[in-house]
């Protein structure tokens, strides 16, 4: 269905995954972080400002949109979160900005063959 390195979470796996996410988000919220659930893909020009350009073809999934728009699936919620303030000038008194992002992340993990170590399996969506 999803090909190599795709998976389903089922039953208690779903419950455990959601419990861990909820615990983490609750912890961050109590520490004063603003919770953010960003979009799963962003425009190419924004992605170019938030990641290393070498990541584009090697690690990121491209999404074909309108004729004039290219989008990329996010590899981390930090990419769209950092872009939220891309045209702002921040005053020192307004810092630090503290965000807790929750999202699925998407990476090709190209060349990841043989890199599964210590029980961690590289997958395309996590």
Name each model feature, range by range.
Residues 1-126:
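TRNA-recognition modules of translation machinery and tRNA-sensing kinases, especially anticodon-binding
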């Amino acid at each position: 269905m999803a090909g190599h390195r795709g998976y389903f979470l089922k039953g208690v796996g779903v419950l455990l995954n959601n419990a861990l996410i909820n615990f983490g988000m609750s912890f961050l919220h109590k520490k004063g972080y603003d919770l953010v659930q960003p979009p799963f893909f962003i425009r190419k020009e924004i992605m170019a400002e938030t990641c290393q350009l070498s990541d584009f073809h090697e690690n990121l999934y491209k999404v074909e949109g309108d004729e004039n728009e290219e989008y990329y699936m996010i590899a981390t919620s930090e990419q769209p979160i950092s872009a939220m303030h891309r045209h702002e000038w921040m005053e020192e008194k307004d810092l630090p900005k503290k965000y807790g992002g929750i999202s699925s992340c998407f990476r090709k993990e190209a060349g990841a063959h043989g890199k599964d170590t210590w029980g961690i399996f590289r997958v395309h969506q996590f």
